[in-house]
Regions:
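Conserved anchor residues at repeat-unit boundaries in beta-strand-based tandem repeats, strongest
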Residues: 3-14, 26-37, 49-65
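N-terminal start-of-chain detector that recognizes signal peptides
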Residues: 3, 13-15, 72-73, 129
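Cell-envelope/ECM-targeting effectors and their regulatory/trafficking segments
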Residues: 28, 45-150
Length: 150
């Protein structure tokens, strides 16, 4: 079934949390009194992303961050790295199960979705539009030593 991982308060979802749905989609956001509140994002199993603002369970506004300016900082920071570093980032995201495409060092929907998942689970934030946070996410991935290379 669906799996919720996050904080609870008095038996209700509260604070940061994420759902992994049985259909392969994913949701990360903030909860208050058991309801989505603040910004959150959904990712389909095909890595299509929707970013929405919620007010106690009601959707206020949604955007496609691939076409908006909200996350261009992350794309720019990713592309500022060398091709080797970009491939290394994708390789690390593959190792932890967030990236399943070719490791080509190119920015795209799949790299974006994988970085959102990583940021939400490891840092409990999706503030990837902030330059310092975008750098922190990419640097942390470059610092991971996951593969046993012989």
């Amino acid at each position: 079934g669906d799996i919720y991982a996050g904080y609870w308060e008095e038996g209700k979802k509260s604070g940061h949390g994420n759902f992994s749905y049985i259909n392969g989609s994913y949701f990360f956001g903030n909860f208050e009194n058991g309801l989505a509140n603040g910004w959150g994002f959904s990712i389909t199993k095909d890595n299509y992303v929707t970013l929405c603002e919620y007010a106690f369970g009601d959707t206020k506004q949604c955007t496609n961050p691939e076409t908006g300016e909200e996350f261009s900082v992350l794309e720019n920071r990713f592309e500022a790295h060398s091709e080797i570093d970009r491939k290394n980032i994708q390789e690390k995201l593959t190792d932890i199960g967030f990236y399943q495409e070719d490791i080509d060092g190119l920015w795209g929907r799949d790299s974006f979705a994988a970085l959102l998942k990583y940021a939400s689970l490891e840092f409990e934030s999706i503030a990837l539009h902030e330059p310092l946070f975008a750098n922190q996410i990419l640097s942390s991935l470059l610092g991971l030593n996951l593969r046993n290379k012989n």
